Amino acid sequence: DSEFAELKIRGKIFKLPILKASIGEDVIDISRVSAEADCFTYDPGFMSTASCQSTITYIDGDKGILRHRGYDIKDLAEKSDFLEVAYLLIYGELPSGEQYNNFTKQVAHHSLVNERLHYLFQTFCSSSHPMAIMLAAVGSLSAFYPDLLNFKEADYELTAIRMIAKIPTIAAMSYKYSIGQPFIYPDNPLDFTENFLHMMFATPCTKYTVNPIIKNALNKIFILHADHEQNASTSTVRIAGSSGANPFACISTGIASLWGPAHGGANEAVINMLKEIGSSEYIPKYIAKAKDKNDPFRLMGFGHRVYKNYDPRAAVLKETCKEVLKALGQLDNNPLLQIAIELEAIALKDEYFIERKLYPNVDFYSGIIYKAMGIPSQMFTVLFAIARTVGWMAQWKEMHEDPEQKISRPR
C-alpha cells in the first residue's frame, strides 16, 4: 500500500507520497507542493532535498558506508583497477574478462587529442594554473566533435569512453605546459594509471619507469574519488546536462565547480595547514584555534557534509599513505605524515570533535601521498578531476536515460 505524509498549510491538509528507497532513507515527494499548496519549499544548499533518482552510489554517513552499484568502496579499492570501476559505474555491473579487455582497448584508442588542441595551450601564459588550462581545453573539445552538439542515445557510450580517455591526456598536457616541458603522447601498451604517470613525468629524452607501489596507490586514489553521489560538481554537471548542453561543455562545468577550495581544492589546503602547524609540539595550539569561534583558523581535512563517522575513503588512504612512504623510504622521516597522524589521534579523543562528529575525510591523507609521488600541489585538483570524470559521465548518462528527467530550474 502507498504511504503518505501529511502537510498542513493554513488549515488545509495535503497528502504527499512517500517514495520507498531500495536502500537508505525513504523520500517525501514534494513535486506537487507548489502547484497545489501555492507555496515553495525552502532548503538552502539542498541539505534535505533529493534532486534525482540514482542507482550509482549509496552513502550512509552515520555508519561510514560508501558503495558503488552495491559494492563496498574498500573492496573496490583493494581488488579492482580504475577502469574496472569506471565500467561498473557506467554500465551497472562489473565487466567480464572480454568486456574489460574491449573497454580498456577503446579507452586507449581514444586517448589522443586533436593536434590542433596544442595551439590552444599556447594562448595561456606560463604561470597559468593547470585547472584553468584543463577547464578551457575540455570545453574546447566541443569544437572537435561537432556531431555531439546534437547527441543521441547511441552516442552515450562512445562519449563516456572518449571523455575518460582524453581527460588524463589533457591533464598531463596542462601540467607540462605549466612547467615549460614538451607534451608527451600516450603510450597505449601501458595501463590507464601508468600511462598518466608516463605523460606526467617522461620527457622526449628521458624514459619514466613507473614504480609499481606508486601506480597501485594512484589507482586506489582514482577509485576512491570516482563518484560520491550528488556533490557540488556532479550536481553542476547534471544541471548543465539537463538543458541538453553537449557533454564536453557539461564536464567543463564540473571541472569549474570542482576547482573551488571547499570541494576539490581541500587536499591542497590540508598540506598548507600541516606546513603551518610545522611541528607536533604546536598541535595543541592549533586545536585550540580550531575551537575558537572568533579565530578564522579551520582544521582542514576534518568533517564532511555527509559523513558523521570516519570517511571510509580516508581509512584506505591512511594505510596507502604509509605504504607509499615506506616504499620511498620516507615513513619515519616525513614531517607532514607525523603531524597528520598525531593531529588525528589528538582530535579523535577531544570531546569538541567527538560531539560534532568531525572525523578525517578523504582529503586528509591524499595530499601527503601526492607530495611523496612528486606531484605538485597545483595538480592535486586536476587528478581529482581525472577520477571524478568517470562519475560525472555515469551520472550524465543516467540522467539522460531517466524518463522523468526535466531541465533543472530551482526557485
From Swiss-Prot:
It catalyses: oxaloacetate + acetyl-CoA + H2O = citrate + CoA + H(+). GO terms for molecular function: citrate (Si)-synthase activity. Its EC number is 2.3.3.16. Pathway: Carbohydrate metabolism; tricarboxylic acid cycle; isocitrate from oxaloacetate: step 1/2. SUPFAM superfamilies: Citrate synthase. The active site is at residues 304, 363. InterPro entries: Citrate_synth-like_lrg_a-sub (IPR016142), Citrate_synth-like_sm_a-sub (IPR016143), Citrate_synthase (IPR002020), Citrate_synthase_AS (IPR019810), Citrate_synthase_bac-typ (IPR024176), Citrate_synthase_sf (IPR036969), Citrate_synthase_typ-I (IPR010953). GO terms for cellular component: cytoplasm. One of its GO terms (biological process) is tricarboxylic acid cycle. Keywords: Transferase, Tricarboxylic acid cycle. Gene3D superfamilies: 2.20.28.60, Citrate Synthase, domain 1 (1.10.580.10), Cytochrome P450-Terp, domain 2 (1.10.230.10). Citrate synthase is found in nearly all cells capable of oxidative metabolism. Belongs to the citrate synthase family. This is Citrate synthase.
